Amino acid sequence: MKRRRPVHTLAIVFGVVAAVPSIAAADTSFPAAAGDMTARGNLLVWTPWTGPGRLMSGFGDAAPPLPIPRARFGSVDLGTDARGRTVLVYRSCQAARPRHCAVYLYDFASQRHRRLAALDRSGCRVGDVRISRGTVAFARDCGGRALDGLYLKRPGKPVRRMRGVPAVRSFDLDGNTVAFIHSQQRDGPEESTWWLTIEVRVLQLGQRRSRLLARERQLVSPAPSGAYVEDVRLDSRFAYWERQVFTEDFRQEILRRPINGSAPPTQLERAGRLYVDTYADRLGSYAVSGDRMYYSRPAYVTGSEAFIAQVAGTPVFR
């Protein structure tokens, strides 16, 4: 579930303004400024990049808005209800009062939405939210209190806290599997610097020990170095995540690994990707559903084009 990233300022510093490559591979795109993205089957839903707007559904210039009131959307996820039907869960904040937020469920069959009031708790706010088989997983932020963490709301049962999951930066839910990104901080080699160790992990609900899939280290300083990971997704027994590599040429990569750890991580081929740039890659959000993968490029610099693209054919990871 999107997220404003500290690396965006890095892209601005590089001052790169580049058009969509004209010869690069056959990834198809259309102009759109997308924030968060989610996909399931042949459905694609995305939020506005900034400010209040409409939730959009579909790929292409003719993509229509969903019949959901205009708002500021903070998190969206296409999943399934208890009967296996496709539904959309999302966090909506009032356009006029952005601190007044709630989580809603949209039913594509009835084209109706309803508030999930059971997720609310006084003094806390809901962050990212996911749904699978009718179970809602959500992050709860209570201002640094002991109540902070990930929670589950199963159909017909009360909200309960998820065991075995620390404070997370990103997470996803698919059936009984939770993937999450966790980070730990320690002092760096100089004043006003620090190290971040960031891990991608998966956990089976009901268990307390998670499996490590990837680990990166980033030195946070006026000139960041190392690598950072975020935006974990689950699909087809794989965990996906984005890696940001801080070198002279800032790079962004989409990786995946089987959730059982049976093979090492592999990276989405860079050839033909429209977010790849000469000095600094410009990947916004991404979404995956089986053989379909989408990604966005936001407009960091006035005059550059924001778009949503689809990877041509079956995505190749090596």
Write out the residue ranges for each language-model feature:
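Acidic, Pro/Ser/Gly/Ala-rich intrinsically disordered segments
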Residues: 2, 22-23
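Bacterial N-terminal signal peptides that target proteins for export
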Residues: 1-11
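Sequence signature of WD/YWTD-type beta-propeller architectures
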Residues: 24-318
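Bacterial N-terminal signal peptides
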Residues: 10-21
